[in-house]
Amino acid sequence: MAKKEHVSETPATAMLKANGVPFTEHPYEYLEHGGAQHSAEVLGLDPFTVVKTLVMEDEKGRPLLVLMHGNRTVSTKNLARQIGAKSVQPCKPEVANRHSGYLVGGTSPFATRKEMPVYVEESILALPRIVLNGGRRGYLVGIDPQVVVQLLGAKPVQCALAE
């Protein structure tokens, strides 16, 4: 029997454990610029269920997190309209790191450095289970999607565009 690969705890998994949230671990070989498509492929998962955590900011530089399907992009115009902002754009990697405390490619919505509003593509909440970043490059965790609403107060939005 293959030995289960152990991954050391991250702030994200510590938060999940502290809140009694059951999760599965999915370590994989990280590929620079591989994104959610790569991790889905390597782990044999549907990219629609692999959720990426995107650090964005509004026109005033206020940070926010967007949870999006791995095979979709964010319509920043639709997102801005739904959250009452003039505009929204992705943060530069160093700014995203400053806000979240995580490296790009390893950003989890859990236990971020700064508390930020979290928005989740509405269709994600209808899935039975999702896989998202566990706080380290090459490390995903599987959870019930309702956890993002319960723990983070994530608000549903409709801003997905097919890639």
Language model features: what each stretch is:
Residues M1-E163:
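Extended, low-hydrophobicity, polar/charged segments
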